[in-house]
């Protein structure tokens, strides 16, 4: 696996650590990254000039990620840089913007950027999944959910006593379509995610 150190700049460290914990979890979940415990690091560089590449080679560290969060008028901004230890160079400098209460989404987007920079393959942490659950202890036993790729930030779209099958996303991911048997026969519905509004394709 790629051996990566993730470091939060001093200052707004608590909020930065919250987002970086999402980045760390996303990358570990791929099975392709080993994330260092910061307590075991010899130093916590804040800038490129602070990096002593020799000590990082002693730790067998492949890459260093240094990140910082700043509050903006519109929300929060995560700035991060990735350094290649073997080649002693910066390989990425990016900024990701988000809403203050959507720090998880910010972390997912950042982890996708880190993953692609290091592996050359686009990440999937910022994508969403959709699934149907079935329970036997209630009348509304079929439920359609969407969630982040890690299964968190779950959002219920529909409850029904009848089966819900074949859910699919619209091209822009703002709507979903599915087959529901709530009227007694198979019927295709399209539903807006943001508003919950839906309509039947077959009248």
Regions found by a protein language model. Give the residues of each.
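Residue-level detector of Asp-centered blade-edge/turn motifs that repeat once per structural unit
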Residues: 121-125, 171-172
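Hydrophobic beta-strand positions that form the internal "hydrophobic ladder"
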Residues: 129, 173-177
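Short beta-strand->alpha-helix linker/helix-N-cap micro-motif
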Residues: 1-54, 65
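Multi-bladed beta-propeller domains
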Residues: 148-165, 191-203
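Hydrophobic beta-strand positions in blades of beta-propellers and related beta-sheet-rich domains
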Residues: 80-82, 144-146, 176, 188-190
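Amphipathic beta-strand/beta-sheet edge segments enriched in Tyr/Trp
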Residues: 49-113
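A flexible loop/linker signature enriched in serine peptidases of the S9 family
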Residues: 122, 134-143, 159-162, 179-189, ...
